């Protein structure tokens, strides 16, 4: 038996993003302690797209009060090291001026993560919206 979920992150608020991602990681650890394997996929689009970028320089998020990406990147790396998959929306990247070579290691790019979301749900993944 495994716990399969697609976590649909759209929030651009760094505090909320990190808090919710920490809860996702906690959930995976909880399942592991119960002897249940987790198969988690994290989708990043809308405001959450920025957290999949290595740097915000030159993007639509490049502002004087831009978020510090380090805490989010640390959590994303931890999520990936546990076997989680990170998928960044190509359409959102284009709209945010985030180049493909500016995406964090371990993440993949899907042109339209709505397609990924529907496909995963049709394969039995629980849909978990995080806005």
Regions found by a protein language model. Give the residues of each.
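Secreted/extracellular ectodomain signature
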Residues: 1-131
